[in-house]
Structure formats: structure tokens, C-alpha cells
Amino acid sequence: MAMTTETVWAALDALLDYAKNCGLLHPLDETFARNTLLSELRLESYEKQEQHFDFPECLNLLCDYAAQQGMIADTIAERDLFDTKLMGFLTPRPSEVVREFRSRYTQSPKAATDYFYNLSQDCNYIRRDRIAKDERWTAETKYGKLEISINLSKPEKDPRDIAAAKLKKASGYPKCLLCPENVGYAGTISHPARQNLRVMPVMVNGQLWGFQYSPYVYYNEHCIVMNARHTPMVIDRGVFDKLFSFVEQFPHYFLGSNADLPIVGGSILSHEHFQGGHHTFPMEKAEKEFGFEVPGFDDVDCCVVRYPMTVLRLNSQNKDHLCDLAGRILARWRAYSDPAAMIFAETDGEPHNTITPIARMREGRHELDLVLRNNLTTKEHPMGLYHPHEELHHIKKENIGLIEVMGLAVLPGRLKKEMADLREALLNGENLRENEELSKHADWADAFMARHPEFNAENAEAIIQYEIGQVFAQVLECAGVYKCTESGRAALKRFLTEVQNG
């Protein structure tokens, strides 16, 4: 049924009311904004309506109208391009956002980030309605509580959009999703629209960088801090100074970097960037397992953390000393081989050792977690020896990047349906091996059903969630270069001796 013009006007009114109520739009700019939107919707007249719609329903109605009128195809990608364009008209200009952020920063860094985070949600860059679909829980493991999420906020691609994207030639502008040229970019079928993106300029160690929020918000105030230049990821001594340069300006945030090698690195290695935010991860809560001292660095507290991945924690009031020691650890690790522990610095000229660093301020002191990583592949483990092993791929087979390293699993959306179906199949006593969708979970389900004779309709979901948590702990154990065993700790101490000897 075709939408009436009155409904479109009402949806338009609702969108403008929303923008005024959350401070995106100044009342003096309302008529200007309405006329801009009317022009975009190819409407030549307007009458005020009584009918009211909430946000984002009003925005969805305007997309419905555009699709009915043939302005856009009714696909997720085309609707996203269109609704982002509309929100772009209502989002304050970059200079206004920067001015407001800096004004609030004089009150406190937190006041500034609160403003910027709320703006990024209000202007629909972060789509609250999609983020709300993500499933989250915590699971108790032998390493303490780990955090689990099933990522449902990234919509599945429409086959029509995939087909259209194949026909579109890449323009090479912007070079990637992290380049500052994305601000205000209209987007294409294969590159998201960014008219409502705002990036805060920040100085990081004397260089111009940008600071924005991730549209997917895997955790509270999930931000991305990226070099203003399109330059590749590199983990070197300078990275530690850069991380602290940012967290000193925003001491309520942590900031970490993905590693700079494939398999153990992030998904974008072509543009230097860090990820941070206002969230306390399981790794940060993990306690000291044992301390160690490094001669010449008496003012740096060093310990190994009780955690499935290999974490060296450095804490000091002297940032320069701490970063110097981190630089030494990185240099030693890059060059370190211990064949007995299956650690090779390189094979056939390909380097394997790197680090995932995470910086934070803790009670006024500088703290740096160095997670030792290695991307060696073997015949038995072609995707990576220190990567989720094949028997865990039914839950998680993707790379273990910074967010997972810190103790938050980002699991694929397919698991929501698979786990609901698994619950029903187990309660009905079905043979999982005869079920095409669920057969990959059969060995795992057999094992945990043996541990849970109490499994019933009331507790089934809680047991499955708990057991997913145990799988995630195993995933992190796989990614840990030194295992939490006697032989693993002995091998780790051999490396620490290397560090201590300078």
C-alpha cells in the first residue's frame, strides 16, 4: 500500500523533533533542515501533522517512502545509504562538534567523551536499535569471568547488494574505512555512507591523529584512534609512547593495539590505528601470578598475569622507563626462538613473533600489558598453531584480535539460531550427528551433556552459555604462546631470563 503524503510529513516532523530533543538541531535551524529534507524526498509542499512516530521508526518510514517512489532499492545497503544521508543533514558540522568537545574537555576529559559518545549515538552513526540485538553474557571459568557476545548488529548482506557491489569499480577514495576522508562521504554500495561520522582531531605523541567511536560498539565507549595518514600498522618502541600519549589525555580510557602480523593481527593492517574505550575487561581484572625483576628497571613493577594468554604486566610512575623496558621486551621477543617450546622467531625469512599491547592509567600510575603473540603455522594447524584449534571452530574460528585477547568473545551471528536449535534437539533427545546444521556441535554437546546430568528445559540455555564460555577459555589457551602448565611456565621463565640479561 502506497504511503500517504500526510504520513511522510508526520515522519519528517518526528525526525526533526527527535533531532531537536537530543540537541543535534538548534530550533533556529528547523525550517532550513525541513526544507533540505523535503528536497531530498522530492516533496514540493508541507503541512504540519498531528500523528507522531518514535525514532528510528520515523527514519524507517522515510526510507520506505523513498523505496516506494523508486528513489532507492529496498535493500539494507541502499536504505543505510539513504538514512545516513538524511541524518547527515541533522548532524552538527565537524567544526561545531570539535568546538563543543574542546569546551567540555575544560570541565573534564570524561565530560568531553560523554558528549561525543552520545552524539555518535544520537546521530545514528552508532545504531542503537542494531546494537541492542547483540547477545551478551559472562561465564565463570578457571581464569575468572570471561565475557561473551554474539554479534548480531552487523546486518547480513542482501544478495542484490552483493551483485551490485561486484559491478561497481572501486574508486580508491577514501583509501580505507579508517581514513579521515570518510567524514561526510556519501558512500557507495560497497563503502558505507559516513555523512553522520565525526572524528575528533587529537595529538598523539606530537602527530595528528583522529578519534572516533566504532559503529559496532563491542563494549562501552568502544573507540578507534587512528593516524591521520594512511600508513601501515607497526608494533615498535614508539607504539608504547603513542598509547600513553592518548590515555594521559583521557585517563578513564584504556587504549590497545592489534598485533602487526597476519593471523594474530586485526582485520585492517593497512592503516595504523588503536582501539580503546571505557570498559574493564577480564584481562585487566586478572591478578598477578608471579613477579619478576629486570636489572636497571627498579622503578618498574613487573609480573606475569594469571590468564590463558601470556601477559607481562608493567606498572610504573616513570613512563619513559616503563616504555624503555617494553621496548626491550619487544626487541627480545621479536628475535627469540625456543624450539623445545615451539617458538620460532622466523621460518623461511617470515617473522612470527609480535606483541598485542594495552595501556591504561591505574591509580595515577602507567600500566602496560604486553601479550606475547606468534603466528607460526604447522601441518597439523595450518591456520595457526597459536590460533583456535580445529575442534573449537564450531564456535570460533576467526582470528583472535585485541578485543578477544582482553577477554571478550565476539562470536558469529549464526550461533544464535544454532544454539536455540541445539537446545531443542538436546531436550528432544535427537541424534545431532544426523542433523546437518548441528552435527559440527555433536562432540562438544556429548562432552558437556555428560558433565550436566541436571540438563532440563529450565536450565538448558544457562548451561549452553556456560559451556560456550569454557570453549572461549580454550580458544584463549590455544592463542597463548606459553601454556599455564609447569612446562609452559618453565619455558616462559627462559624467555624472561633473556630479558633480564639485557
Model-derived features: positions:
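Catalytic or ion-translocation cores adjacent to nucleophile or general acid/base/metal-coordination motifs
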Residues: 238, 247-270, 276-330, 334-337
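Short secondary-structure boundary/capping segments
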Residues: 165, 271-272
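Active-site microenvironments that recognize anionic phosphate/pyrophosphate groups
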Residues: 1-225, 229-232, 306-308, 322-326, ...
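Helical scaffold of the NTase/Pol beta-like nucleotidyltransferase catalytic core
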Residues: 196-198, 228-255
